[in-house]
């Protein structure tokens, strides 16, 4: 029996090693197979969001069988002049152009109107013709979504939609909990407003403090406003949000809400807010997934978790198969929400003020802590110690706080009758 158990552990360890250990990719290229009619041609796959790297690759790549995935930043109309010059270099290097369905674009004259239809740039030993049937096969999945839903001249970005879903569902859930607790619904809108303000400003300022402190000197107004002033005034949205900063800010705004508006113990509010934040965090990570950001480290291409993000920013390094760490966190947050919701609905823990919130803190930041082992650094690591990155070090105090809050929650028990009354 011991021999069988040992072999079982050995197999399990091998599977874990296969799935979770980081992988090295020479020259930043991954492998795929280009199927041309009945012929299989091994190709090296390259992608980048940086124009300089894209241009350089056309000149230095010597591999006769190569496929370049063009992402949206490579073919934007706004960059037509520079992009067309780069693509002309590929044409001179005997590459051929294809659309998203692998239809050959013959004798192309690149214009501002057709540049966005180009998706793949391919070079093979034998040129491909329009009569050939072409497809790409890889051992990993390729995640290359559109940025949003186009409604005439307006684009509804999926990242923004995920935030809307998060706050919309949060409003519904908070209303439902206030009804369950027999609390006047006039108190729902203020907590929604203050949480929104705290989340956006706290997440933005937290990101700059922990990951991009140089912005305070280089582009001060971009810290507080969704604009950039470095190369003229430009609307950018808030590019860079940190959950640790959002947490601190929401704690502070909720204190104000608790003492000045609803006049209840802040722990009572935190218990319910934690449930909402758990599911909201899942939506935010889905938004990161659509944006190809907060990605994981390189992974073995045969791992069931391997995913290629052609639209990833070059700040994460080479574009090769990686862990979808956004999804790992999102799944963890959904499970946390389910647990907290069941405890709130089926037990009396909601009357032990702070217990649910403490549990929320422990599990949420534990999820963040462990997923960070598989995640690429987000910019320069402002804090690092003993092999832990900034995100992990910042998570530890929150987990400790969760344990402390759970222990002291015994002192803040209330009855069902007291639950509905403002303090």
Model regions and ranges:
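Low-complexity, proline/glycine-enriched hydrophobic segments characteristic of transmembrane helices
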Residues: 20-151
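A feature for loop-to-transmembrane-helix boundaries and adjacent hydrophobic helices
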Residues: 2-42, 123-423
